[in-house]
Amino acid sequence: MRADVQNLFIGIHMLYFAHERKLTVSDMQAELEGYGYRVGEREVKQELERLTQENYLTAHGDEYSITGTGIEAFKAIHAKLQVLCSEVLTPAQTAASR
């Protein structure tokens, strides 16, 4: 997977988890590795900081929590993913079956 695409997925995962609970670098790294991402602590920290700069997360010492802006962004992403998944995850129609 291209790095830019992977980073988008990682950001979405982070917003999802932040919507559920506070995040730490080590917890998030373990979660992401559980999904098959090969990420180091530095990459996780950079993505958390990027989401913080975009006002999607706020830092509280070593923990990060989602902001109102982050919640709204997550809702918008969720809606787009529902549409995308309904299209991408259904078997493609062949030209003959149309």
Feature map (PLM): residue ranges:
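Short amphipathic alpha-helical interaction segments
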Residues: 38-53
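A short, conserved structural fragment
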Residues: 52-62
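Amphipathic alpha-helical dimerization/coiled-coil segments
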Residues: 78-98
